[in-house]
């Protein structure tokens, strides 16, 4: 039994009268779907502006956002999509469900983001998209990846599910000349329980218009006679969710500023614990939105890491084991897996294998707490690591 107990952390999701008033506003407008109301339209305009994008399209969840973006980028049977081997499974399954082959590549041992050299080595004539995931809100090396994209002609699709409000060398996600997707699932940095968005930079208006049709059963905005222009599905976000997301967006920047300040302290405290290595940074990623507080205990086996997480949870911390390497999940091999064995992929993804075994993360609400709570958090982690 761990002698120390965690302090109270701020609740998540957070809400106040802004969400309440938004829900009433959506209710009273009398139209609760996007084709009849204005909450989704307003949220899309506000979210696009906040991220420097030309357009935003709100959808049902982050996985659908990825599927939709990949589809309008031409991903399908006979194509390949490069993804990080260390990521949530949706990054790979979104491509696999479209009939493509997902090619996992290794990540950097310090930042947990795509290794550009590994990406360059994985590009083939079949590669249709390169998908960087901005892990825990730390943006991937967009300079190196943009150069690979320019040299090969393979476009980037940013999986920004963790990176609401993040920046790379002063540029927002929508200003980096590539399509990006976001998630608004319950634990994310802004949430309506579920939801997602695809943002399109200048020059991608045609893909945006196609995506709108695809996400609405092929129907144009003004269709009243069931003229389905192209094949599609129903991925439309509802008006209630959009009203909540508008309120969530309004407080995003303030929360990011708090998390950033708190991470500076917590990472220093974690780094002082023998055997603990906090997630590294990149000075070019000059605004990290801090979706997770991640750290490694290099050399720890997966079994011992899992026991460590159990002790942290028992003490009251919102702690989690890191993502499993996607090639070590059964789901990865069901559809669109490369013609390689698990061991073959693991040999070229040593960092992923290590991180997925020895990494722990804390939910971002920890970073909304005060300094005393962070000191207490570090003490609990130090005690648990000493017994790991």
UniProtKB/Swiss-Prot annotation:
Any single biological process term in GO: polysaccharide biosynthetic process
Disruption phenotype: Inactivation of the gene encoding AHBA synthase results in loss of rifamycin formation; production of the antibiotic is restored when the mutant is supplemented with AHBA. Cells lacking this gene do not accumulate aminoDHS, aminoDHQ, or their spontaneous aromatization product, protocatechuate.
Residues with the N6-(pyridoxal phosphate)lysine modification: 188
Pathway: Antibiotic biosynthesis; rifamycin B biosynthesis
Keyword set includes Amino-acid biosynthesis: no
The protein's required cofactors: pyridoxal 5'-phosphate
Subunit structure, as described in the record: Homodimer. Can interact with RifL.
Effect listed in the UniProt record for changing residue 291 to F: 7-fold decrease in AHBA synthase activity
Cross-referenced PANTHER family: DTDP-4-AMINO-4,6-DIDEOXYGALACTOSE TRANSAMINASE, TRANSAMINASE
Annotated effect of mutating residue 236 to A: Loss of AHBA synthase activity
Job description of the protein: Catalyzes the dehydration and aromatization of 5-amino-5-deoxy-3-dehydroshikimate (aminoDHS) to 3-amino-5-hydroxybenzoate (AHBA), a compound that then serves as the starter unit for the assembly of a polyketide during the biosynthesis of rifamycin B and other ansamycin antibiotics. Cannot utilize 5-deoxy-5-amino-3-dehydroquinate (aminoDHQ), 5-deoxy-5-aminoshikimate (aminoSA), quinate, 3-dehydroquinate, or 3-dehydroshikimate (DHS) as substrate.
The name this protein goes by in its record: 3-amino-5-hydroxybenzoate synthase
Any GO molecular function: transaminase activity
Gene3D superfamilies linked to this entry: Aspartate Aminotransferase, domain 1, Type I PLP-dependent aspartate aminotransferase-like (Major domain)
Impact reported for residue 291 to A: Loss of AHBA synthase activity
Coiled coil: none
Source organism (scientific name): Amycolatopsis mediterranei (strain S699)
Pfam families: DegT_DnrJ_EryC1
Catalytic activity, as annotated: 5-deoxy-5-amino-3-dehydroshikimate = 3-amino-5-hydroxybenzoate + H2O + H(+); UDP-3-oxo-alpha-D-glucose + L-glutamine = UDP-alpha-D-kanosamine + 2-oxoglutaramate
Gene behind the chain: rifK
Regulation: AHBA synthase activity is activated by 3-deoxy-D-arabinoheptulosonic acid 7-phosphate (DAHP), an intermediate in the shikimate pathway, and is irreversibly inhibited by gabaculine (5-amino-1,3-cyclohexadiene-1-carboxylate).
UniProt miscellaneous comment: Mechanistic studies show that the enzyme-bound pyridoxal phosphate forms a Schiff's base with the amino group of 5-amino-5-deoxy-3-dehydroshikimate and catalyzes both an alpha,beta-dehydration and a stereospecific 1,4-enolization of the substrate.
Swiss-Prot/TrEMBL keywords: Antibiotic biosynthesis, Lyase, Pyridoxal phosphate, Transferase
Keyword Zinc-finger: no
Cofactor: record remark: Binds 1 pyridoxal phosphate per subunit.
